[in-house]
């Protein structure tokens, strides 16, 4: 009754009557839809989701030419009443995206008995008008689903089906609820058509709706519902109905449920964990009412007044999960008290005061919560600081093992618990709030986490789910998957144990610990000392011993007895020492000894909740197998070995553990008991009693499951024993277990020649022989280029890697000496790793050096400043400006340039020959009109002036002398008039043909358009090449970074620091932990080496390709289409150095126009004569009924000739089938890539992973992302520009202006006579002065001679004075 009252308070708006919705004059009942959620009765829950809204209208459009459309929606539901009519639904993005998936669903009008529908989830290249379909053909590509599915509806059965989506998750509501994932769908638009309202009324869903459900019995008849209007969000997010088996329903959003952790918290990812997610009982409680009760771990959950929501488990709980919406609910004074198995109570007390915990319920939310533990036994209390709790608490988890988690993180570890006492008062301000208690057990689950919150959860408790968990995937595609040992279908291997037979003597080591509690309060403890076999020191002399304890403690009357604890600094404790641990020597002492570890014994004070040291046992021990600790005496001769021969077994042989097949051999060895390889692997062992040698061959029991349509239909195993399937069939190399014994003919799974059907049947598939097509000749449609554009394509090819060397020992051990000793046991592991990298680097360096050479002469030729161009210099023989006059012309003549009519001026010059007198006689006629050139020099001007003056001198007598002047003037005026006429006609032609004057501009625009288009394509190739360069430069850095990151992994050791491990543990335990690190780091290192070797192989192949491209593209012209530049006919190529490779610039002719023709391989004449083209590179095709021949590279059709053909034997085309093994015989250099990789991997060393400080690695990354994005943006902009130019070209009319040109006439005008007279006078004066100077100066001049004569007469014959000349030597 209280349970009903609870939900009357929380679900204040629940009305438990059937709620029908008006739908096209019909009512819609949603109980059948809600029954698909399998909510276990009795339950009262709030169901939230993208569901039909009972208050919204349904779309009932049935017109043939109309479609209903919804935008911004997240789902569509269909209501069916009767008549079995058809419908069509299409779902896509609002802005159609052909690169993503769309959904199409169509149901024909085909009744209800065997009705079906077509469901497709594909990528359609363009928008489609929503219409029906009648077959499986579709224009969609890359379909995830293209099926013909059952679609039978039942009349008048309240059937509502639908599809909803949220991000990538798509949900189908049909016979049950199905979930699957369509990546990046971004659906938001629905288009639908319905042929009849009774069959397919539609409702589009765009928001979450909440319904109150009251489930009393299974099925639709036991469900009542109504729309929830109050506190709905919280109820739907936190309360669920537990499914059968304790599973949380998949629709639960896991709000306020966290992944428990004792260390770090997972932020994002998928992980497999063992945590308390199996729910025995879920109880929802209102905060208004509060709760005070005790929850026991030894019995099923029982909350007085409340019952479980959904399925109710009968087992006891391992953990209680408290899902709270109020932080104060669990941090208040005495809200949570833990009852331990030894009777101690531990309560959690929180306060806003860090120094003094107070029992107060008035905590301030804006201040930190300082929490303490109050440990009490009787009236004694011990308060210790616990931690600072988070300001917001959403989940509180308490396990029976004494762990307390807050929001998923562990805050308290205490002793195992028997119960939890709650005292949750109704102090919250949110009186309408609620919280839940879930009694849970630990189970194996797969969890997806995002932002530390649980997104999805999968229970690994079924064979199918176990496979999914092993693959860390919530959905698996059909295929074959490995089966783990925890799968119920897995076959376990027998265990082999071999040890030496021993004759044992046994002894007991008795440890006595004593002490007394007095009667004071709290009681005080006094230790009486510790004895070993009633003494102080015992060394074991037998080869077996058992350690026993006797606690002799005196207790007061109010204390419990026999509560002891212990701690150990030894690699064992008081219990595990008897579990067949072996020693070389071991001694026990009650006083400290050199090299001894300690076992300390404590007695617990149940009144004061304080532990007291009762005694200490010191243990000295050495490694060996002489002495064994046993739980009981095993005296006498004992051989407990157990052998399983000739089968794959898990063995423990003389301490070696592994999996192998043990076989008896005929070999004998005198020495040794077991025999190993150089690497330490067990090869054989000896039976010391009989001397027989047994070999050990490693084995692995391989088992795979055939997974079809989310279920296991069969198991492939190497073992012939299984109890889960009805049939076992034997095949070469394996056994197949299934429930279907028929032979599979239409397989769903195919691997090699094995096929598995949906039912689990298996069959061997025979290869199908290809039937040769017998026909006269083959023909088909091909495209031949008709036009080309020149383009530059950029290509990058890597030539070498950066060499990497790894110090294996330093990487694995980080300089730790003890770790290096352990590493030496791995024999050649480090040697193989280091040598593999070094040999690969040296081999690559040698190949690169032999490939690349440097030519000094070529470098000089490439530099313009150093190019030896010779000593040619033509500046002295060429004019300064083209077309200039000579110097004499510049001095003697003035040049006048005018326009002339046709050939008038040239004819006039030839006639007059430069004589002015012949001016009028050489007059020319143009179009019947006499004309003279318009320019007259001075001679002509004076001549016609004299003629005019002469005609005027004597009046009428001499008037005829003026006629030449008149004729000349009229002729020259005619010349000017005709020039004007030509100019006018040119102006008229310009005006008439302006609209077609842009033809050259159009051609220019077309050229610019093509250039921009090719530039855009070129920029794309540059961006791709730069992207490859960036990947090459950064690829190795990423690998090294990943290798360094592995150093953070502890590989299941307690720490990733070797020094830290040895500082915290004893040597034996630390060696085991460090061995895990060594194994893991070697695995990481081997993975890096394998990746590096693979990269070396890839670069070697690219280096070979680069050499081919240099020879074929750079040094010659490639005949191969697309080999140099991806597409087009190759012209020439250039190469440029790039980081770790070469950048090729290929100039190619790219086809930009094609013509489609029907090509034929040859001609068959009367079925007797077969003819085909003789020359390669040509194609024979049919066009308009005519046979033509054209080069394949360029469409140049012509009629075929006899010389073009060669006759072949027959018209029949023959096919030759060969096997893969025969291919190398036909093609010797053929390489089977898969086989080569298998051989490489088989020869690689057994490799592993590393651990180093992250600051050791420093790698600079080349980031060209911005440049590449910029190039791509520019390319896109150029492409858009070319489209704009194309539009402009279409808008320009073709125009052509053909002007009538006037000749350009050059006339040289002679200077007048007085100019020449002045020139002559000037020359006479200059010559006179020069002559005078010559005869008047010098010793031989006239003046000089006369002066000498006159001087001799006056002075007589006395010679003139002169100075003597001295000889001067010049050195």
From Swiss-Prot:
Compartments, as annotated in UniProt: Virion membrane; Host endoplasmic reticulum-Golgi intermediate compartment membrane
Residue span of region S1: 24-737
Region (Heptad repeat 2 (HR2)): 1228-1324
InterPro entries, alphabetized: ALPHA_CORONA_SPIKE (IPR042552), CoV_S1_C (IPR043607), S2_sf_CoV (IPR043473), Spike_S1_CoV (IPR002551), Spike_S2_CoV (IPR002552), Spike_S2_CoV_C (IPR043614), Spike_S2_CoV_HR1 (IPR044873), Spike_S2_CoV_HR2 (IPR044874)
Region (S2): 738-1371
Chain positions covered by the region annotation Heptad repeat 1 (HR1): 963-1082
Segments on the Intravirion side according to the record's topology features: 1333-1371
Coiled-coil segments on the chain, per record: 1030-1074, 1260-1302
More about this protein: Bat coronavirus 512/2005 is highly similar to porcine epidemic diarrhea virus (PEDV).
Protein known as: Spike glycoprotein
Originating organism: Bat coronavirus 512/2005 (BtCoV)
């Amino acid at each position: 009754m209280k349970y009903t009252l609870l939900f009357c308070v929380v679900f204040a708006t629940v009305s438990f009557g059937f709620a029908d919705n008006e739908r096209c004059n019909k009512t819609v009942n949603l109980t059948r839809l809600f029954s698909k959620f399998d909510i276990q009765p009795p339950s009262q829950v709030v169901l939230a989701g993208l569901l039909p809204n009972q208050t919204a209208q349904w779309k009932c459009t049935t017109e043939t030419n109309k479609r209903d459309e919804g935008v911004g929606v997240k789902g569509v539901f269909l209501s069916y009443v009767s008549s079995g009519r058809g419908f069509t639904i299409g779902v896509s993005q609002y802005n159609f995206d052909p690169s993503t998936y769309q959904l199409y669903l169509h149901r024909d009008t085909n009744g209800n008995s065997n009705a079906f529908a077509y469901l497709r989830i594909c990528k359609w290249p363009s928008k489609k008008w929503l219409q029906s379909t009648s077959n499986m053909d579709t224009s969609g590509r890359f379909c995830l689903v293209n099926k013909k599915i059952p679609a039978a509806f039942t009349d008048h059965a309240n059937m509502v089906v639908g599809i909803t989506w949220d991000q990538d998750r798509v949900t189908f509501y049909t016979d049950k609820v199905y979930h699957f994932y369509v990546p990046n769908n971004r659906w938001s638009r629905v288009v639908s058509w319905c042929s009849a309202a009774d069959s397919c009324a539609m409702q589009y869903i765009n928001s979450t709706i909440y319904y109150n459900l009251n489930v009393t019995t299974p099925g639709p008849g036991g469900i009542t519902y109504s729309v929830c209007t109050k506190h709905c969000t919280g109820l739907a997010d936190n309360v669920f109905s537990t499914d059968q088996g304790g599973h949380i329903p998949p629709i639960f959003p896991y709000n306020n449920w966290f992944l428990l952790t004792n260390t770090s918290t997972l932020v994002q990812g998928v992980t497999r964990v063992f945590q308390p997610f199996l729910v025995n009982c879920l109880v929802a409680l209102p905060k208004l009412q509060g709760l005070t009760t005790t929850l026991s771990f030894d019995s099923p959950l029982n909350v007085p007044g409340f019952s479980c929501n959904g399925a109710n488990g009968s087992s006891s709980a391992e953990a209680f999960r408290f899902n709270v919406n109020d932080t104060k609910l669990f941090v208040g004074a005495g809200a949570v008290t833990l009852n331990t198995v030894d009777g101690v109570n531990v309560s959690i007390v929180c306060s806003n005061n860090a120094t003094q915990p107070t029992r107060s319920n008035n905590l301030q939310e804006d201040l930190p919560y300082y929490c303490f533990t109050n440990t009490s036994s009787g009236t004694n209390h011990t308060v210790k600081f616990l931690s600072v709790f988070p300001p917001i608490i959403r989940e509180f988890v308490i396990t029976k093992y004494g762990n307390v988690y807050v929001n998923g993180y562990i805050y308290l570890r205490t002793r195992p618990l028997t119960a939890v006492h709650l005292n949750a008062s109704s102090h919250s301000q949110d009186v309408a709030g609620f919280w839940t208690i879930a009694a849970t057990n630990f189970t194996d689950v797969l969890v997806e986490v995002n932002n530390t919150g649980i997104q999805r959860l999968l229970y690994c408790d079924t064979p199918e789910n176990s496979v999914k968990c092993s693959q860390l995937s919530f959905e698996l595609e059909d295929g074959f998957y490995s089966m783990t040992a925890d799968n119920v279908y897995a076959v376990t291997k027998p265990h082999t144990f071999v040890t030496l037979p021993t004759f044992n003597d046994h002894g007991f080591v008795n440890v006595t610990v004593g002490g007394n509690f007095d009667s004071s309060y709290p009681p005080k403890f006094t230790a009486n000392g510790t004895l070993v076999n009633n003494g102080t020191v015992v060394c074991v002399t037998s080869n077996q011993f058992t350690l026993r304890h006797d606690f002799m403690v005196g207790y007061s009357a109010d204390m419990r007895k026999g509560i002891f604890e212990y701690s150990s600094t030894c690699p064992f404790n008081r219990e595990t020492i008897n579990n067949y641990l072996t020693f070389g020597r071991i001694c026990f002492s009650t006083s400290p000894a050199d090299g001894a570890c300690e076992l300390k014994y404590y007695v617990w004070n149940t009144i004061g909740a304080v532990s007291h040291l009762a005694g200490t046992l010191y243990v000295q021990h050495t490694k060996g197998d002489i002495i064994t600790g046993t739980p009981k005496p095993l005296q006498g001769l004992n051989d407990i070995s157990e052998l399983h021969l000739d089968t794959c077994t898990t063995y423990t042989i003389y301490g070696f553990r592994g999996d192998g097949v043990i076989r008896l051999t005929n070999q004998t060895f005198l020495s040794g008991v077991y025999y190993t390889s150089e690497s330490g692997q067990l090869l054989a062992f000896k039976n010391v009693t009989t001397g027989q040698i047994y070999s050990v061959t490693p084995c692995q029991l391989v088992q795979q499951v055939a997974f079809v349509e989310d279920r296991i239909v069969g198991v492939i195993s190497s073992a012939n024993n299984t109890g889960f399937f009805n049939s076992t069939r034997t095949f070469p190399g394996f056994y197949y277990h299934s429930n279907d014994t028929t032979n599979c003919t239409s397989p769903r799974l195919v691997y090699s020649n094995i096929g598995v059907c949906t039912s689990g049947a298996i069959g061997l598939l025979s290869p199908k022989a290809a039937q040769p097509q017998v026909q006269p000749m083959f023909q088909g449609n091909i495209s031949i280029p008709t036009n080309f554009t020149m383009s530059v394509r950029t290509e990058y090819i890597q030539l070498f890697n950066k060499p990497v060397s790894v110090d294996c020992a330093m990487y694995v051990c980080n300089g730790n000496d003890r770790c290096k000793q352990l590493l030496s046991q791995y024999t050649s592991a480090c040697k193989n790793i280091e040598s593999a990298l070094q040999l690969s680097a040296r081999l690559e360096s040698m190949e690169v050096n032999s490939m690349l050479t440097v030519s000094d002469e070529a470098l000089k030729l490439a530099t313009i400043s150093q190019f030896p161009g010779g000593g040619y210099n033509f500046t002295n023989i060429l004019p300064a400006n083209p077309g200039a006059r000579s110097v004499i012309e510049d001095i003697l003549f003035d040049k006048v340039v005018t326009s002339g009519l046709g050939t008038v001026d040239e004819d006039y010059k030839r006639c007059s020959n430069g004589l002015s007198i012949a001016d009028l006689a050489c007059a020319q006629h143009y179009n019947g009109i006499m004309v003279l050139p318009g320019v007259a020099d001075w001679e002509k001007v004076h001549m016609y002036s004299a003629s005019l003056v002469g005609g005027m001198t004597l009046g009428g007598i001499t008037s005829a002398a003026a006629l030449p002047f008149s004729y000349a003037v009229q002729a020259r005026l005619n010349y000017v008039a005709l020039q004007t006429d030509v100019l006018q006609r040119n102006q008229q032609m310009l005006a008439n043909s302006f609209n077609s004057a842009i033809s050259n501009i159009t051609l220019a625009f077309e050229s610019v358009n093509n250039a921009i288009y090719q530039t855009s394509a070129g920029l794309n190739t540059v961006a791709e090449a730069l992207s490859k360069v960036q990947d090459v430069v950064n690829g190795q850095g990423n690998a090294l970074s990943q290798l360094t990151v592995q150093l953070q992994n502890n590989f299941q050791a307690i720490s990733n620091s070797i020094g830290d491990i040895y500082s915290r543990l004893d040597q034996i335990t630390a060696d085991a932990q460090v061995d895990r690190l060594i194994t893991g780091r070697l695995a990481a290192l081997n993975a890096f080496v394998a990746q590096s070797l693979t990269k070396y192989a890839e670069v070697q192949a690219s280096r070979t390709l680069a050499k081919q491209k240099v020879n074929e593209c750079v040094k010659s012209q490639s005949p191969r289409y697309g080999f140099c530049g991806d597409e087009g006919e190759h012209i020439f190529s250039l190469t440029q150095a790039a980081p770790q490779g070469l950048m090729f610039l290929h100039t190619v002719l790219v086809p930009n126009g094609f013509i489609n023709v029907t090509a034929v391989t040859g001609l068959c004449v009367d079925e007797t004569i077969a003819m085909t083209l003789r020359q390669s590179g040509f194609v024979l095709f049919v066009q308009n009924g005519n046979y033509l021949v054209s080069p394949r590279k360029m469409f140049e059709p012509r009629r075929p000739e006899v010389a073009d053909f060669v006759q072949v034997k027959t018209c029949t085309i023959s096919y030759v089938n060969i096997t893969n093994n025969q291919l190398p015989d036909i093609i010797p250099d053929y390489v089977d890539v898969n086989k080569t990789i298998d051989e490489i991997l088989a020869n690689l060393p057994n490799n592993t992973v590393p651990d180093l400080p992250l600051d050791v690695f420093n790698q600079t990354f080349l980031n060209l992302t911005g440049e590449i994005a910029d190039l791509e943006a520019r390319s896109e902009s150029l492409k858009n520009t070319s489209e704009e130019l194309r539009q402009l070209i279409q808008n320009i009319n073709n125009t052509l202006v053909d002007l009538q040109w006037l000749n350009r006439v050059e006339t040289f005008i002679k200077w007048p006579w007085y100019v020449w007279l002045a020139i002559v006078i000037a020359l006479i004066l200059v010559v006179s002065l020069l002559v005078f100077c010559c005869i008047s100066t010098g010793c031989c001049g006239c003046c000089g001679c006369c002066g000498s004569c006159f001087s001799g007469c006056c002075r007589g014959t006395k010679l003139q004075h002169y100075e003597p000349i001295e000889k001067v030597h010049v050195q």
